[in-house]
Amino acid sequence: RFYYSRLEHSVGTALIVWNFTHDKKQTLAGLFHDVSTPAFSHVIDFRNGDTLTQESTELNNQKMINEDLELSELLFSHGIYKYEIDDYHRYPIADNNIPGLSADRLEYMFPSGCSLDAVWNMDEIERLYSQVAVLENADGLPELGFLDQQAAFDYMRKFIEVSMILQHNEDKVSMQLLADIVSRALECKLIAEEQLFTISEKALVEKFDALAKDNVDESFTRLYHTFRNMKVVQHTQEPLPDSYCVSVSVKKRYVNPLVKLGNGTSSSPAKAVRLSELNKEADSCIKEFLSFADTQFGCVPWC
């Protein structure tokens, strides 16, 4: 286990973009892509009802960047305008649509895999990263991909292995329950919305502990005690009595990376195709993941 913050993710994303582009604007777009992310990160997407795309917390990104005068002056001194770095979606190396591989996706899955299920070690990460290169996809756009089919397969398989954790009701219950705790705290004015951007998650949890101990609001206390004390999530087709139950579909995070074919020449660049077109096992693995569905409900007894 190790500490992994949104800042570290953003710096890592920027470093990957720089490694493959040496472009300041793309790199800064990667660095600032999550500045509007509040405490508890994607939990707030659940609170906003955005479980399928989990992008609602990005909505204020451009606004926050464009309102920062100090940042504007610093960028201008380097000949860069804020509009050139306020949306990393315009740079396909930084971000692209699933199932493509981007710096953002490449970065978050390595530490996530290390912490959630220990699927990577540093030697594996170094081996796989050394096989990543900028390739051209079917739309003629640059995209991160692999020089070696085996490396692409190993990365895809472990990516899906980690992503499967997020498809289970255990994760859905945890995310939605914490989202409801935050919502109740805001409804009761136990915290203010701006504190999600000014107070650390550790400090907020300590505040929640104290609020629950003092039982300042019965509904908040019940939600929080359940979150703190739940042991086993029941997988059911119907909601259970005397239980907190969740039924929600969530974003399916996976990659079907490009693989370079041959070496190419100056007049005829090497082509790249999706891994699933080259490897039947990869195709089956992806299809199995996409077809997976947990039971309709995940439930935990109220505490």
Give a label for each model feature.
Residues 1-25, 39, 43-303:
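Histidine-centered, transition-metal-coordinating active-site segments
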Residues 26-34:
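Short alpha-helical catalytic segment bearing the HExxH-like zincin motif
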